[in-house]
Amino acid sequence: MTTRQPLYKSLYFQVIVAIAIGILLGHFYPQTGVALKPLGDGFIKLIKMVIAPIIFCTVVSGIAGMQNMKSVGKTGGYALLYFEIVSTIALLIGLIVVNVVQPGAGMHIDASTLDASKVAAYVTAGNDQSIVGFILNIIPATIVGAFANGDILQVLMFSVVFGFALHRLGAYGKPVLDFIDRFAHVMFNIINMIMKLAPLGALGAMAFTIGAYGVGSLVQLGQLMICFYITCVVFVLVVLGAICRAHGFSVIKLIRYIREELLIVLGTSSSESALPRMLIKMERLGAKKSVVGLVIPTGYSFNLDGTSIYLTMAAVFIAQATDTHMDITHQITLLLVLLLSSKGAAGVTGSGFIVLAATLSAVGHLPVAGLALILGIDRFMSEARALTNLVGNAVATVVVAKWVKELDEDKLQSELASGGRPITDTRETDDLGVAEGPAPSIK
């Protein structure tokens, strides 16, 4: 029988306390709060430092160790099908809610009076994101460049190709696979060390947010924020909840299982900060490494449910606030554009806001200057986006793993029932995401 660790040693508790302290510091001592921004930035940079090698190790080890290469293509196909269906539902829900609630109605803002210079940089970056450009950008100019820039999709593409090539080498490639497995141990140990700094990162990021923007900015456009937050909660509990029930598990138990990762995302407003831990958690939940390695990184670009809800709601809100008429044709056009543009929301600084700028420019009917209306509260809305995206990718991983019969359902139910152990718990040798002993044989 193991002794339960004290509450104060739990990362879950430490991050909650850090967020609370950050809010108080930012509110009562705003200058101090703003000065703490480097804590949050530094923590996120530390995480990003190891994301690329962790994705590489996980994907290569998973693919190279598979017996049947057809299953990789099958997994990718099912994942993209799931992503497209669920993200479309998210876009539709956002569109329906914003039309029913109409949070921007009655504001009567003249778009010509808005300061478009505040959003000029976002519009420029958004216009640079074409569909063809996005697809071509998945192919790295150099291998080193993909890792140096930390571009998730470029690293993922190279990792898949490398994994296939290593598998084709058979026994000759086994020493390379052994090295990659051991290198993965080192990377996940680094993550464990970095995660001890998560409370400091959450404190700094939250103190800066409240100190820089103030609690008052939460009230100014509160109706849109409340509407968006409620919609995200309903989407998770109803839509994702129904998907989970249909596949034999509970979304509430899944949320409880990834509670530490959700708190880290809440504190940093960056879903990337939880990516390495999600790779470990989903594999521990019973999904095969090959599935986890493909679905989680790909989902960070193609399965952004929270961002999808935000994009439709924000676009129509701007139309309502500026008294810009949008009939059913305009809204269908908006939806079709977002079905494409929303897939480019990852790997770009200020991703959701930039994609929104690109969408408004592409639709043409909506005033791009209207982005200035939500620029001040976008930082607060990004937290709900990131949390919803994280839960969505966790659900996607389990569902796709079940579809391709790469899910240990007994392990799934056992882990969900227990609520999950902290990742720093070393009672099992595979807690670092890689099994001890020799690498899997390559046939």
From Swiss-Prot:
Which residue ranges traverse the bilayer? 10-30, 46-66, 78-98, 130-150, 152-172, 199-219, 224-244, 291-311, 332-352, 354-374
Its main localization is membrane
This entry carries the following GO cellular component terms, namely: plasma membrane
Q: Name one Pfam family in it.
A: SDF
An example Gene Ontology biological process: L-aspartate transmembrane transport
User: What membrane topology term does the record carry?
Assistant: Multi-pass membrane protein
Which SUPFAM superfamilies does the record cross-reference, listed alphabetically? Proton glutamate symport protein
Check the record and name the PROSITE patterns matching this protein.
Answer: NA_DICARBOXYL_SYMP_1 (PS00713), NA_DICARBOXYL_SYMP_2 (PS00714)
- Example of a GO MF term: fumarate transmembrane transporter activity
Q: Region Disordered: what ranges?
A: 415-443
**UniProt KW keywords:** Cell inner membrane, Cell membrane, Membrane, Symport, Transmembrane, Transmembrane helix, Transport
Q: Where in the cell is it found?
A: Cell inner membrane
Protein function: Responsible for the transport of dicarboxylates such as succinate, fumarate, and malate from the periplasm across the membrane.
Family to which the UniProt record says this protein belongs = Belongs to the dicarboxylate/amino acid:cation symporter (DAACS) (TC 2.A.23) family.
Q: What is this protein called?
A: C4-dicarboxylate transport protein
Q: What is the lineage of its organism?
A: Bacteria, Pseudomonadati, Pseudomonadota, Gammaproteobacteria, Pseudomonadales
Gene giving rise to this polypeptide: dctA
